[in-house]
Amino acid sequence: MTDIATAFADEVVTNAYTKIVAVPGIEGPVALITLDNGFDHTKPSSFGPGGLKALDAALDEAFAAHPVAIAITGKPFIFAAGADLKGVPSITNRDQALELGRLGHKVFRRLRESSVPTFAFVNGVALGGGLEVALHSHYRTASESAGALGLPETFLGLVPGWGGTQLLPNLIGPSNAVTVVLENALNQNKTLTPKKALELGVVDAVFGSADFLEQSFAWAAQVLAGEITPTRPEIDRGKGWDDAIARAKAVVEGKTKNNAPGPVKAVELLELARTTDLTDPASLDKGFAAEDEALADLLLADELRAGLYAFDLVNKRAKRPAGAPDKSLARKVTGVGIVGAGLMASQLAMLFVRQLKVPVILTDIDQERIDKGVGYVHGEIDKLQGKGRLSPDAANRLKGLVSGSLDKAAFAKTDFVIEAVFENLDLKKKIFAELEEHVAPETILATNTSSLSITKMAADLKHPERVVGFHFFNPVAVLPLLEVIKGEKTDDATLATAFATAKALKKSAVGSADLPGFVFNRLLIRTLGEVMNAVDEGTPFEVADNAIAELGMPMTPFTLLALVGPAVALHTGETLAEAYPERFHNSPGLEALVEAKKSAVWSYGADGKQVVDPEVAELWKQGDKASTSEEVLDRTRRAFAEEIQIMLDEGVVAAAEDIDLCLILGGGFGFWNGGITPYLDRTGTSEAVNGKRFLAPGVASV
């Protein structure tokens, strides 16, 4: 075993099987290589050292047959899903990291430098190294049913390291390459459909899935006969490339504030590709060597380990929520009631009817509000139909399931009722008391409260055991987090039903104890509070707002404040200040902002430049103790570390991993920080504040 193979001792090897076939219309044998790790599509083929060597051996066999062409494809539904990342934590030195990059380049470029034409028949998912195999091939076809194509590496903290950064911009142009390598990857890991891949020039042809291989071979025969010559765009290596790199830098700055090394290195490699000549092996050597060096740097970076940790949280822990009771206890939901018909309630109605496909009834204080809520849902369904995502029949069926009533007696046959009204405890208690008069004893009463006590809300009910917190994040259709809060008397059947319903709604549920602010809002308000307190003391708005970009939040604190709404933030802050007065303090500046009914700190001039709203500058009184950006960052980090440890001690969540999951799914915190606790460990903040790390050494770190 080589050093790198030792690191990947547990690799599920993707084998490569060579078959020499006769193809109608092609004179001479064709070598068909199939990538297959021996499992079905739920375990995609990937490349570790073993898989790369298997492909290398398959190419030896193919070339030995003296074919007129070589084609490569994958097992059903999967072409190849990139590098095997399971061995990455075992890579401990730079030589190992360099070896992995060089091995991939050595094997893949055999397709590019082949003296006979090479074809990639992309029959299914092709991501990362999988797509790079296709890019090294001379020609590419894709099945119309291929699930996803893309280069998602920067999303995790890597770069496309087996040719992607050098080949793609020289194939489809630098601007399109920026879209695939950076813009899509950093936009929640967006991928390409086969149709879009064809439009961009990533593939040369798209065929139906039923006879994809046959059509691909027929197309290859026409290429070999000279009847088809795939077009390649002329690449602008001057201003066009300049503009693309400027856009790349803007994307990375906007998404990561340049705090994630992977995307930053990707920009550098895309710039280098300007001078890479795909017809010159020496030029390719230089470009690929730069990829090897970048990959080695990143494989040994804490940010990549944090990214893999975050990826694991989102794809594994989120699917098995800690603290969820046995799912067999969950009751079936066949009808849903929603109290409230405002924007949040209407979004909930849309989600429930779309995902559960059961009757949904809205109620509110007057018919006008109800009609508006039902109309909103119908309008959203019409939009989906207009985009071709729903057939006319399906759209009509969904619209027929949504209704409204002024009378809560209409909820008599519902199994699950959720209130989404103003954050007032007395109002919510009154609503639940009224509902108890009309619904069955086992009907779930859920609350979308963002901070109020579930236990207090249920205290006066005949059946407090069926009350549960079910806190969504806005916009409901976009943010995947759902906090499930157990009140003092919430029973296991109710809790199990809540978790099962969250899964049916395609949301990621995190269980929380019934303490003010629950998980996300408690940390959000603590963070915003530190920034606003710094401004109250005299720190300039611009300094305070930009000081904590390193934390990985997707927007600055005052931009987030405008999105949440100052009044909502103040109300939640007041709830937390009442519960934890030693750590949460109402900002006089925020109170003044709310009193003046101002919606934001920032305003924008005709030139689009962001400035402090003059009225806000006047009403927000400041002291004379200005902090530097470093001081604001330090106090915010320390506040995070302190609050998280207290929450863990209180049992708000089961583990630090759940804190990170909430921040990633509810607030879009960066993968490169693993949420927040890996970052606090990496910067030494955890130990400075709490005397210990949140995560064990080697977890989300080198």
Q: Where do the PLM segments sit?
A:
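Amphipathic alpha-helical interaction surfaces in cytosolic regulatory modules
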Residues: 55, 60, 76-90, 108-111
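N-terminal glycine-rich phosphate-binding loop for ADP-containing cofactors
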Residues: 4-12, 16-28, 36, 58, ...
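Gly/Ser-rich catalytic serine loop of serine hydrolases
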Residues: 120-130
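A short, well-ordered alpha-helical element
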Residues: 45-68
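Conserved catalytic cysteine-centered active-site region
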Residues: 108-120
